Design a protein with these regions (language model features):
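Charge-dense, helix-prone N-terminal extensions
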Residues: 1-144
Length: 144
């Protein structure tokens, strides 16, 4: 019985951690030129918003800063303050955009989709960049 508890506790460890892998190398390896350009733009925007250099979290998330969290369950870990991942179908932004106070901004953003805490954008040309900058800044402020 104790063996199972140990395994379960270890399994609850956060799998996405900051790495020392090269962010510029990761972005340079994005096969789609437009997505690569969008990723470079997001790096600049998020770096300006946080004042932090980008780090690769896990194999495919570019994150800025670090935020320590503790859930009511006792599980805790670290995550980037804001982050994005240039996935094949869309850019995924982890900026707390789906918080209820951001609804009016999302209505002005342009073409996008949302998931649980994520913002999906096919290409930056589809959105209002000023609104996106505001959403990123709000995501940073939320974890300050």
């Amino acid at each position: 019985m104790a063996e199972k508890k140990k395994a379960k506790a270890k399994g609850s460890e956060n799998k996405t951690k900051a790495t020392s892998a090269s962010v510029s190398g990761f972005i340079a390896a994005i096969p789609d030129a437009a997505k690569r350009a969008d990723a470079k733009t997001l790096v600049k925007m998020m770096q300006e918003a946080t004042g932090e250099k980008p780090k690769l979290w896990g194999p495919s998330i570019v994150g800025f800063g670090s935020h320590h969290y503790v859930y009511e369950s006792g599980r805790e870990g670290d995550m980037p303050v804001v982050a994005f991942s240039p996935r094949k179908p869309a850019l995924v932004l982890y900026i707390a955009a789906t918080d209820p106070p951001n609804k009016p901004l999302l209505a002005k953003l342009g073409r996008h989709a949302t998931g649980k805490g994520c913002l999906y954008i096919k290409k930056l040309a589809d959105v209002d960049m000023t609104v996106l900058e505001t959403l990123i800044a709000k995501g940073v402020a939320r974890r300050a």
